[in-house]
From Swiss-Prot:
Skewed-composition ranges (Gly residues): 21-35, 42-52
Organism lineage string: Bacteria, Bacillati, Bacillota, Clostridia, Eubacteriales
Origin: domain of life: Bacteria
Species per Swiss-Prot/TrEMBL record: Clostridium botulinum (strain Loch Maree / Type A3)
Descriptive protein name: Large ribosomal subunit protein uL15
Oligomer and partners: Part of the 50S ribosomal subunit.
Pfam families: Ribosomal_L27A
Annotated stretches, region: Disordered: 1-56
Functional description taken from the UniProt entry: Binds to the 23S rRNA.
Length: 146
């Protein structure tokens, strides 16, 4: 095979539908749009969710809940993610972002107790779960709420 013999795979290039080019083409006259009506017109059709005048599903279902604009959103990290740090490191939210353990700090960092920690670390964060505090202190580390 040579470079000039390269060809697209069978069915990879599909010809566009040429509509409205005579009845013999099979797509003449109404161009596959059926008879008259809203859908046959240029720009015609109904909006998404419209059910022909019947009360639409999104209005038949009850409203539920709300978004509390004052809620604090914490970046959650499990203990096993902190094993990437050396012994004696002071782990701060800035260091976590720098080491790509967390993408964004948001309103602070919350340390959760899933997994085990083998290193002796000083961890500074906005919140800690009870199990996280126990495990960090059992490993000989310190917990500081900032």
């Amino acid at each position: 095979m040579k470079l000039h013999e390269l060809r697209a795979a069978e069915g990879a290039n599909k010809a566009s539908k040429r509509v409205g080019r005579g009845t013999g083409s099979g797509l003449g006259k109404t161009s596959g749009k059926g008879q008259n009506g809203q859908n046959s017109r240029s720009g015609g059709g109904v909006r998404p969710g419209f059910e022909g005048g019947q009360m639409p599903l999104y209005r038949r279902l009850p409203k539920r809940g709300f978004k509390n604009i004052f809620a604090k959103e914490y970046a959650a990290i499990n203990l096993d993610r902190l094993n990437c740090f050396e012994d004696g490191t002071v782990v701060t939210p800035e260091l976590l972002v720098e080491k790509r353990v967390v993408k964004k700090v948001k309103d602070g960092v919350k340390i959760l107790g899933n997994g085990n920690i083998e290193k002796k670390l000083t961890v500074k964060a906005a919140k800690f779960s009870k199990s996280a505090i126990e495990k960090i202190e059992a490993a000989g580390g310190k917990v500081e709420v900032i």
